Amino acid sequence: MLTFQNLVFKVFIVIQPLKDNIFKLIYKIKYFNQKYIESCCEIVEKILEFKQSTGSLIFLYFKVQGKNFGSKERKLITDVVFSIVKNKSYFQSLIKEEQLNISNLSELRCLVILGVTSKLGKEIIYPFLSNIEKNFLSRIEMKTISSIYKEFSHSLLLNEKLSVPSWIFSDWISQRNLKKTINFIESNHSDFPIYCRVNILKRKVKDVMVKIRDSGFTFERSGLIEECLKFSPGENVNRIKSLFAVGVIEIQDLGSQLIAKLVVPKRHQIIVDFCAGTGGKSLALGMHMKNTGKVISIDISSERIVKLKKRVSTSGLKNIWPIVIKNLEDERLIKYFGTADSVLVDAPCSGLGTLRRNPDLKWRVTESEITNFSKNQLKILTKASSLCKIGGYLVYATCSTIYEENEMVVEKFLSNNVNFDRCCTNSVLEKQNIVLDKSWNVFDSYGNIHLWSDLTDTDSFFMSRFIRTK
């Protein structure tokens, strides 16, 4: 029998999505105006020079112009700019098809029009366009990645329509297959979560969760690493900057936290973080070692080490020993030869596993640069391995999805260094109660780990672990 309460509930279920869409439309109309188009044009023009990352250019723009925009307005502009960078060659192909009809329009202006349309819809931007721009937009039919795949699956233009350089596209397909590659590309266009690591030396995870929940955040605790919190896409974690300021939490991708776990840090060990950067993994290692032993954080950049020291000071850790080296032959490395229980090499790489956050990288990185990265990675891994004691462990990781930076480096290293053998990464993690979803299929037949963002909802990472036998 249909009660009054059930009737009200059913009506609510029907009306609620419509109501939400109306509110979203009102929100877009309220905050969008001509200055957004101009701002997007300014930012995208700089980005297309490919001298700096998308994120850093947006940050610099708002640093100067920030007083003119509220947080909601900045988010709208950021979303549009990222859409343009992610879809660059697809948008350019649409513009090219209409070239004869838009001879008086700049490509930059057209890119921004398409970017706004892709994120906010035609109805939002239409009132701010000239007649020729309206005619251009009226002839454009935006397609989803899946529909592009169906239409161009047998075309040489597929990678262009999907906005991926051909050499990257070919590499991904050779590693996985076309269908999985399409899924991966689609995931790089979607909104993504933010992961944080709780510093359990300062605060219990449950206490931090209460504090964050009281601040109105939507988040969940990772089922893999108990110190890891996953915030929903769009959450502004800067609203809890008080927790960051005192070192209670750090932004760190789940994949990055898994790398630290693959090292298996233990109390009183000596662990070398060979490419420490600003110290994200050094901090995680030091925490897991309960502030005992030594984490020797090595980097070639004094600027990065300065930032690392600041983070160490905030974290409360006393077991981090930062060292700046001039090059791989620096004499300061000699004293550590054959002493480390574990050595982590999170090698400098193309960063193509971070395309969700850094979409410009696919346009900035070249094939020749990949070759240079690969050669340098092998040199770094080889030198770092000399710091590992007999019976000690070596972990190699990148945030790249390119074969030449990952498996190829590992194969060359093992062929040149017969005193190192592979480890079973699956069992290493399972012994720490970290059981990765079997459907992710992250372990290859050699024991390497591949995290692909379409499956794991993390940045994409490659990891491998070895033991020094003699």
State what each model feature region is:
Residues 4-470:
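S-adenosylmethionine
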